[in-house]
Design a protein with these regions (language model features):
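Bacterial N-terminal signal peptides that target proteins for export
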Residues: 1-5
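C-terminal segment of classical bacterial N-terminal signal peptides
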Residues: 9-18
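Peri-catalytic and regulatory segments of divalent metal-dependent proteins
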Residues: 23-171, 191-194, 209-246, 250, ...
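Hydrophobic alpha-helical transmembrane segments
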Residues: 173-184
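Start-of-helix register in tetratricopeptide repeats
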Residues: 286, 319-320, 400, 434-437
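Short coil turns that delineate tetratricopeptide repeat
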Residues: 315-316, 396, 430-433
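Canonical tetratricopeptide repeat
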Residues: 323, 404, 438-441
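TPR/TPR-like (Sel1-like) alpha-helical repeat modules
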Residues: 347, 415-433, 443
């Protein structure tokens, strides 16, 4: 499973699959992974199936599935193009959906539900990379990996305290909601998806995923590109999930590159990949903006800056400028990038302990008490202000830029300027969902000090 993002972290628009301008000899035999035809369902398997069916319903009920028809249709088109034609599997109904989670992750449930988080899709460069993620997850379902892993480990899991096993991983917001749902309904899934399956099963999913990509005429070297993207540690998280375990990711890069051989850079011309990247970004732009807000809401401020900058680089004179301003405003006194020292295992452990004990506001106060924090805060406020002003200078400026300036000025003590920006926002967006809250902020700021 391509891991790294979502609450439970499970192990990677309408464009046609990239077709080669001319057929090239595949670096490996382009055959889909064989179905585990010897697999027979037993009671323990049917019990697990019942649990994961309930998980699907809970994800929908609790608002964790992204309600965007175009995005989910896009995922379904890619997924269905990878599934071998005519394939039928007992107790499998293919579903491909996006999950509202800013952590990069993807996972497959054994009933055929494939989930990719908004956090992962926001990091990818093109459709072929998304196909690589889905192909990996499809293999887990087709080879019945979840059932086999459950059969081999369920007795051990029965003696485990699942929450203590993931104790250091205690996210809030959307991410915490997913963890809660999964641990309540199917605790085994948490272990499998956070830590991945056995090395042999994950390797099989990687290599057979490449074969599936070739069969669907996706450039298979993009499987390696996905691993390289995920190998970038933006948040410095201490818990090693399947998709952010960097030593393991490097090992996967090595054996995938070896599997592909020396043809990795020759299968698809770079210009064709660049065109595909542009098409992918056009399709994913709304989703990536949504993911920036999720990242801000869950305290993943560096990820918000990273994704917003990707959007601005792709489409500079657009609403994306506002989102980059929001990301810098909320980044506050934090450094935009972690140092090598902060990315060491010991530093990550210390940071995880601190996150458990303090709120974002407390972290802000701590950092603002240091010269570095004060310097970062000043630089990021200035950067955010410039970006908000730039957003307001666009042909169709978003009123939310006035709200952002109001929040920025209020925090820095510029009360009169904050009121003016809030009033402008209220005037331009009278039907905004936060209109009443903004009016109350205006009233509060206008009151004379006691």
């Amino acid at each position: 499973m391509l891991a790294g993002a979502l609450c439970f972290c499970i192990a990677f628009t309408s464009l046609a699959p990239v077709a080669f301008s001319q057929k090239k000899k595949a670096p490996v035999e382009a055959t889909p992974p064989p179905v585990n035809e010897e697999f027979k369902f037993g009671k323990v398997d049917l019990d697990l199936l019942e649990q994961v069916d309930l998980l699907d319903r809970r994800f929908e009920r609790d608002g964790l599935v992204l309600e965007d028809e175009a995005t989910n249709a896009y995922l379904a088109r890619i997924g269905n193009s990878l599934v071998p034609k005519g394939l039928t599997l007992e107790h499998v109904k293919w579903k491909f959906r996006a999950l509202r989670d800013p952590q990069p992750n993807a996972f497959a449930l054994p009933n055929g539900s494939i989930y990719v988080t908004t956090g992962l899709m926001s990091l990818l460069d093109n459709e072929s990379q998304l196909a690589a993620v889905i192909a990996h997850e499809l293999t887990h379902v087709m080879r019945r990996h979840t059932y086999m892993f459950n059969r081999s480990n369920r007795k051990k899991f029965l003696t485990m305290n699942i929450m203590s096993a993931i104790g250091a991983y205690a996210p809030g917001g959307i991410v915490g909601a997913v963890i809660t749902v999964v641990t309540t309904i199917a605790p085994f899934i948490v272990i499998a998806t956070i830590f991945g399956y056995s090395r042999d099963l994950e390797r099989e999913a990687d290599l057979k995923g490449i074969d599936m990509m070739i069969s669907a005429e996706y450039p298979p070297e993009e499987m390696v590109s996905v691993m390289k993207l995920l190998n970038k540690d933006i948040e410095g998280e201490e818990v090693r999930l399947f998709y952010n375990d960097h030593p393991a990711l490097q090992e996967r890069i090595n054996y995938l590159s070896s599997y592909l051989g020396a043809r990795a850079d020759k299968v698809t011309p770079q210009m064709e990949l660049n065109r595909e990247k542009a098409a992918y970004f056009r399709k994913m732009e709304p989703l990536m903006r949504h993911d920036i807000q999720l990242a801000i809401n869950t305290g993943r401020f560096r990820s918000a800056v990273y994704v917003a900058q990707r959007l601005v680089d792709f489409h500079p004179d657009s609403e994306n400028v506002f989102w980059l301003a929001e990301a810098y405003r909320t980044l506050g006194p934090r450094a935009a990038q972690l140092t090598e020292k902060e990315l060491t295992n010991s530093a990550k452990k210390d940071a995880a302990k601190k996150r458990e004990k303090r709120t974002v506001e407390e972290e802000d106060r701590e950092l603002l008490a240091t010269p570095a924090g004060q310097e970062n805060s000043k630089a990021h406020q200035q950067k955010a202000e410039e970006l908000y002003q730039q957003a307001l200078g666009l042909e169709n400026p978003a009123p939310t830029a006035h709200r952002g300036l109001g929040m920025l000025y209020e925090k820095s003590g510029r009360t009169a300027d904050a009121v003016a920006e809030y009033e402008k926002y209220a005037e331009l967006a009278p039907n905004a969902i936060d209109h009443d809250r903004i009016q109350k902020r205006i009233e509060t700021l206008r009151r004379p000090p006691p």
